[in-house]
Amino acid sequence: MASPAPLTVERLGFAWPNGRTALNHCSFQIPKSGLWMLVGSNGSGKSTLLRLIAGLLTPRSGQIHTPLKAALVFQNPDHQLLLPSCSSELLLALPEGLSSSERSDRIHTALEQVGLSGLAQRSIHTLSGGQKQRLAIAGALASEASLLLLDEPTALLDPSSQADALELVHQLSHRTEQPLTALWITHRLEELQRCDGAAVMEEGHMGPWQSGQALIQQLAGQLAPLQSGRAEG
């Protein structure tokens, strides 16, 4: 028997209190684990979609189906890192009912998975931006989430930290045992080269999945006339 799709969204609709529609009959499916990316202009509904999947917002219509626990990773990790040390931050994410040794083991494993071994007692304010983003991902892993929702996680990082964060999520979503499913919003077209599928969101609708390289070429073709016009003008 085939495993259920990690995520299925059916005719999802959402409007803000001011009446502005953010999503309108948005439907798509992530067919398997891996790294899946969304691009789109500001206001196209990308971030709203992630918050609906994470359960932070309630849809006006439609359904979300997933057998996985979801966790949202924000653009700015300072918005979700609340406690003074790495270990105390991860304690917030752990399931209830664990023994002291189980909590310690879970924290150690989560930090090891994101390349932060040995930093359990490190003060969060001493971490670099890239390390903070890794810690935010470690919190998702410690919570036993296997559906990562990443809202432009590299937007505030330097190029080296950006590449490291992308490689980390790529590895976690392609590991042999229990690979994660990651839905990643980006404005950096070069990041699409690492994904298993990419799609464009426009006016609350999501287009079909295609390869990252194909989408790069499509978007480059759309931008070329605009750039040419600016040069001529």
Model segments located where?
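Conserved ABC ATPase "signature" region
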Residues: S101-L119
